[in-house]
Amino acid sequence: AGVLERDGLFHVALDGKTARTPARKQLAVTSRPVAEALAAEWQAQAERIDPAQMPLTRLVNSALDGVEDQQEAVRAEIVRYAGSDALCYRAGEPEPLVERQNQVWQPILGDIEALIGARFLLAEGIVFAEQPKETLAAVARHVAKIPAPLALAGAHNVMTLTGSAILTLALANGRIDPDATWDAAHLDEDYQIGIWGQDEEAA
């Protein structure tokens, strides 16, 4: 596997031919390092292709086949998540969990509020809190800045995994790293594990 530069894009080449996505689009990106990483994933494959060992290829396929032609719908879905964001729903008890949520989530939330220039409403438990239209409009303006299709596909994946547009924006804007994003998204679960231990089936 190698990389071919053509028409301002870097194509993944297999045996001299341009690789294609499942939807038959050319597997090509605007970044040479990304293209080289894609080629390395393909080069590492044995006789049988194992998609599970090709996370970057899966992301780029998703970006080119599922996001590139549906950018507005993908952006709109991220904004919808902001309307019921996981970080806005806080525990009322026990006190250690309440404190942990405040310690971990509140700085991230405050950072994103400062970034977008708008405030989120918080709720306790599962009572729905409708976010102000101004807040969602501010989120939409910043989601619109996420480059497509690759970064947008990555952001959509993060949102799906975390249930949080706030965490997605924080990661996309370099406010937190991937490990902190994951830890924040699984704060409640990690707290329960700390109390009750690891669920063997979940593990």
Question: Where are the regions that the model predicts?
Answer:
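An N-terminal structural lobe/cap that precedes and organizes the functional/catalytic core
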Residues: 1-69
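Solvent-exposed alpha-helices and their adjacent loops that cap or buttress functional pockets
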Residues: 4, 20-21, 80, 144-147, ...
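Short, charged/polar micro-motifs that form catalytic or ligand-binding hotspots
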Residues: 25-28, 94-98, 152-157, 171
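Generic secondary-structure signature for well-ordered alpha-helical cores
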Residues: 43-47, 110-117, 171-176, 186, ...
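Short coil/turn segments at secondary-structure boundaries
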Residues: 51-54, 124, 197
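Internal, conserved structured core segments that host functional sites
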Residues: 72-138
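An internal, amphipathic alpha-helical element
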Residues: 130-201
